[in-house]
Amino acid sequence: YIIGTRVIVGTTSMMTSKPFIFLLKHFKLAIIDESSQILEPNLIGLLSAVDKFILIGDYKQLPAVVQQSEQDSGIPTINDSQKGGIIDMSILQDICLTNCRNSLFERLIHWEDYEERSEFIGILRRQGRMHPEIAEFPNRMFYRREKLEPVPCPHQLETELSYTLPSEDALDDLLKEHRMIFLPSKFCKEPNVSDKINANEAAIVVDLLRRIHRFYGERFDAKKTVGVIVPYRNQIAMVRKGIEKLGIPELEKISIDTIERYQGSQRDVIIYSFTIQNIWQLDFLAGNSFVEDGAIIDRKLNVAITRARKQMIMTGNPEILRNNQIFSELMNYVKEKGGYF
């Protein structure tokens, strides 16, 4: 059926900027991928021009970037007056339009829950990225409803990591044995230095990169083997400086970026530097969270962990991170599995 069908692929911005396309051709079906990252106004024109639509996305990962605060984009919960008239806010509440920063995808999911319906929702339970030992924590904390399962792909069936060179020390042994690892960092705040920089964690990340490059040898691929995620661009620069000092050209080509820009990407090994050294920075690090079925869904942490195919390595200050429930549970989980150094 698909082979005999003419399929047109384009971005939402391209399609909406060329409305004449819909005058030339009528589409029976529109499939919108990554729809949880698209705001409702950007989709309405497209969806009204087709007979049927399918939205694909994950509202438990990062949503669209909105400049307004959550309060400013929110819908009042009581009736409001405007130009002498009365707006009945209950109408919007009934269709789960509670905040304009939410995607249509997320609103429809909540609307179905609110109406206790499920016939319009399909869950893709199979995932072909994370090894089961990495997927266990996101499943336990974020995907209790969905209960993701491996496809399985070949790397998801591997029982051991392919690090065969002799170990240099205990950390190498840990890297060989565990897929979820946490390395504690130390306080290293300096006067007149940005809070968005952590020299100790940058050094840890650089050392980990050296070790991974050594283990992979000729198999190392800068675009596939390893990636580094940090919350601040200042930290990216510090890690880059450390890599330059190693004198390993292949490592200078790896991707080091924020969680927001890493969404949609994957690497065999992901190194996540929490970076923060102040309790107040936890609000930024875990700011994109919500509660579902009594459980906290931390979208940023979810994205970070689910980028990894074979190994997830994290470094952060335990004394700071313990002040956040999810981060505390993450460290406890890694300890329970033996991956806490």
Feature names for model-found ranges:
Residues 1-14:
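Inter-Walker segment of RecA-like/P-loop motor cores
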Residues 13-15, 20-32, 36-341:
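Conserved helicase motor core of SF1/SF2 NTP-dependent helicases
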